[in-house]
């Protein structure tokens, strides 16, 4: 069984400014803006590939969203979610239930599964564990996470991968 760090999501006041800063520092580019985020989230995003992983820059588009409240509690921009890709979702789901970790959001289909775990139960960050058909492929279609030719935006001149995430509560 394996679990791979796929994506780090940031919550920020201004997604465009932070995406531009990431480009200036790391040479990475926005590959995708998800126009299909659930309205209940009240967020906009920018996805920037880092090799075969992503940095997702999220910012609130309206008042009183979970992301906006977290941004206010933090007192500024910061980490929001750690998103991992699993080779098998069922054992992770069983372990989460066994530990009594609250699941904030979940989706199970024949081609993709995800569960977002409550930050109070995971040390200060949303932890999302995903599985999809073709999970062993490091450069999959990611049809559930990103649409379009995102691979065309991979820039490895300054950074090639995300190797860790340090979580603060």
Regions found by a protein language model. Give the residues of each.
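A gly/proline- and charged-residue-enriched helix-loop-helix capping module
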Residues: 77-100
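Core segments of cupin and vicinal oxygen chelate
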Residues: 2, 6-53, 92-117, 157, ...
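Short loop/beta submotifs within extracellular cysteine-rich repeat domains
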Residues: 30, 65-66, 137
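Vicinal oxygen chelate
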Residues: 56, 93-159
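N-terminal beta-strand motif that seeds the catalytic metal site of vicinal oxygen chelate
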Residues: 1-19, 77-84, 134-169
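Short loop segments at secondary-structure junctions
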Residues: 52-53, 62, 87, 120-121
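A broadly used, surface-exposed interaction patch
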Residues: 55-84
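A short alpha-helix capping/helix-coil boundary motif
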Residues: 24, 70-73, 154-157
């Amino acid at each position: 069984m394996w679990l791979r760090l796929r994506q780090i999501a940031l919550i920020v006041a201004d997604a465009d400014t932070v995406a531009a800063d990431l480009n200036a520092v790391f040479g990475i580019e926005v590959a995708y803006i998800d126009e299909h985020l659930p309205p209940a989230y009240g967020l906009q995003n920018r996805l920037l590939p880092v090799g075969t992983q992503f940095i997702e820059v999220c910012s609130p588009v309206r008042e009183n969203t979970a992301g906006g409240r977290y941004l206010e509690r933090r007192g500024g921009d910061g980490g929001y979610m750690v998103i991992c890709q699993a080779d098998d979702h069922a054992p992770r789901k069983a372990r989460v239930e066994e530990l009594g970790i609250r699941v904030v959001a979940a989706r199970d289909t024949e081609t993709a599964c995800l569960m977002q775990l409550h930050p109070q139960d995971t040390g200060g960050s949303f932890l999302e564990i995903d599985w999809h058909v073709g999970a062993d492929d490091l450069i999959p279609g990611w049809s559930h996470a990103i649409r379009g030719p995102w691979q065309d935006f991979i820039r490895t001149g300054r950074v090639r991968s995300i190797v860790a995430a340090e979580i603060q509560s």
